[in-house]
Amino acid sequence: SNMELAANMLLAYHAPLEAPMQKELTCPACGHSVIQYLNPAPTTDVVIYDPERGVVVIERVNEPHGFALPGGFVDDGEQVEHAAVREMREETGLDVELLGVLGVYSRPDRDPRRHTMSVVFVGRPRDAAALKAGDDAARAAFYPLDRLPQPICFDHARILADFGRWLAGERTLAPVEPA
């Protein structure tokens, strides 16, 4: 019956998740029970593109080792666009103009360290010659899309493929929120 179907759907909807979304902790000071929510960490990455040089790829100092787009974590109280510009300056020395949002990438396995959710921008360097590795980048260089170094970490190969589709006119960018 419809009522039985609705009841089963409701039970299925309220079934426990495979991975816990929260855990119960005890406050060491007062002994009260508190809930810690296990949310993805907000991050941002930027495909910095110069038509003559290609895209900026960094070689990572920290685990996982390999090559990646420059990016990092959004600080508490920080607008994601500001975090993107800050991270580019820290990792590449470049002052970047954000052209638009390529996409949001949030697969739980995209980063082996923890679940992250990245807002990925396409950016243009104001002075491409200022490129220099910094922060947690061993090296930073421009690479043509057809000659990227390997291995590419995280889901950045997928992001770069999406960027290639944007360059080919097969994808659009979402606007950047004004500061």
Describe the role of every protein-language-model region:
Residues D50-E91:
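Conserved Nudix-box catalytic region and its N-terminal flanking loop in Nudix hydrolases
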Residues D162-A179:
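Charged phosphate-binding loop/patch that engages nucleotide di/tri-phosphates or the phosphate backbone
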Residues Y105-A130, D162, L167:
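Active-site-adjacent beta-strand/loop module that shapes the phosphate/pyrophosphate-binding cleft
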Residues L94-G103:
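A short coil-to-beta-strand element that immediately follows conserved catalytic motifs
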Residues H14-D45:
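Acidic, metal-coordinating catalytic segment for phosphate/diphosphate chemistry
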Residues K132-G164:
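NUDIX/MutT-family hydrolases
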Residues S1-A12:
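Extreme N-terminal basic, low-complexity initiation segments
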